[in-house]
Amino acid sequence: MIKQVKRFTSKKSKKTVNAGIVHIKSTFNNTIVNITDKQGNTLFWASAGGCGFKGAKKSTPFAAQSAAEKVGSMAVEQGMKQAEVIISGPGNGRETAIRALQSCGLEVLLIKDITPVPHNGCRPPKKRRV
């Protein structure tokens, strides 16, 4: 009997998007960069931990820069030229991630900060005594 050989194709479909939205979530421990289209569907994402940084090195601005460069280069390869940037969180890698996106060739149209600010909500963590 003759067996049919199955040909495997990648499940990821290549989309060409001219403009998108870059979501940067910068916490005290990590930085996550996520690129979506205008409807909010995720196209590419990377984090500082996924780029090889572990432990305390994940929260550095250099780790955020490398995650943003990784995502930005993938987006430029797919044909993205313009992006809106939405930042949330109080972490270190906010500005360096935006600069890394601009250096990859993305034109930043708008920068929006949606960091949640409490109106005297929960008690903050105690101060460290080293």
Curated annotation (Swiss-Prot):
Molecular-function annotations in GO: rRNA binding; structural constituent of ribosome
Pfam families: Ribosomal_S11
Subcellular localization, as worded in the UniProt entry: Plastid, Chloroplast
Record GO biological process: translation
Keywords per UniProt: Chloroplast, Plastid, Ribonucleoprotein, Ribosomal protein, RNA-binding, rRNA-binding
One GO cellular component, as annotated: chloroplast
Family: Belongs to the universal ribosomal protein uS11 family.
Subunit composition and interactions: Part of the 30S ribosomal subunit.
Protein name: Small ribosomal subunit protein uS11c
Originating organism: Emiliania huxleyi
Gene: rps11
